[in-house]
């Protein structure tokens, strides 16, 4: 969002963030005619904690006669029925029912592969208390396994294409180094993993990302998933760190 990029303190100043949230609420209420509906559509979290819907026609849709908004905080879904679903207050009939239930971000796809490490642990077991790795790239006990834009790297909080390219370049340079020096295996140390995860979370705790908002950045949308802030905040500083390591 160009709007978000125009200010450098939205992620660290609650006052500045609240001003931005008020602006967003105002814009939504200008588009949605029914103010009670508009109020329900206004995000109740800090800006950036969860992604905004910035589609040009999304909010206009709620002005149509054949569209209604049901707040499941007020009317929890009870059951799926033969013709639709029922809430605590009413039954709704549909031609189609789309289940937008979210996704297991950053770790789910990797854990579904059931990767076996060299120390009898699977990746699921290694990450049982949250993703543990070094630079978001490599894990102890999993030699020559590299993750691209995974947890512990800027990934979803940066330009993803640029982040992918930086990771591929880093891994490629490492593989060339290994070949030139006759190395067959490479993995992070356990302590390097611990220190890196502490650094990732230490940076996040200085921002509003961890100020009580239950987002998928924390894995809060998945029941039972450890609540740990997964992305590294700050692409330039991350690249600088990777460059320092490569030059060492």
What do these predicted regions represent?
Residues 1-248:
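N-terminal FAD-binding dinucleotide-binding subdomain shared by FAD-dependent oxidases/monooxygenases
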